[in-house]
Amino acid sequence: MKIGSIAALLSLLLLAPTMQDFLSEETTRFVQDSESSHDGLPMEWDNKQVICIFFPIEQPHEKYSQGVTMIDENGIELGVNTDLNRTGACVGGFEGFSNGLDFMMNSTRLAGGALSVGYDVGQWGAFIHTIGGLNAGKLTGDFNGAYWSLEHNGAYSMVGIGDLVMSEGDVVSWSIGTW
């Protein structure tokens, strides 16, 4: 009896992470509206503030290299959307932020350091050079230079993150741009 109980308990302990991942992915439903800046994000984040960090295929993030990991406002991973043809992480479900830089710094902290942000402040405001350990200025390839590109609700932002005024339901995303 004891050996059977111990074997069952060990099996349960070994399978718990796999079952948790399966249940998390099965219960997370994503917005499917190509006209919405929330397309591909969890449905519970619709009309909430979200930040997404997308890493280049050539420079995948160590932790977020398979699809886009969704992290809620409490730092809990909700699941991974593998249908976005991108890799990275989105942190969302927020309300009430009005300053883009404050939102970015507060939301990325919830990834437990995996999305740490490095920036310099110059005459034009905050310049983001590193996200999640990837310093755009150190990238090499078939291009002259690289930078972290900011999008606001699916369009290139006309202002930097320090001057970005947030509204409810805004989606901010970062990806590597080159010239």
Which stretches of residues belong to each language-model region?
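Ubiquitin-like/PB1-type beta-grasp interaction modules and other compact soluble beta-rich domains
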Residues: 2-179
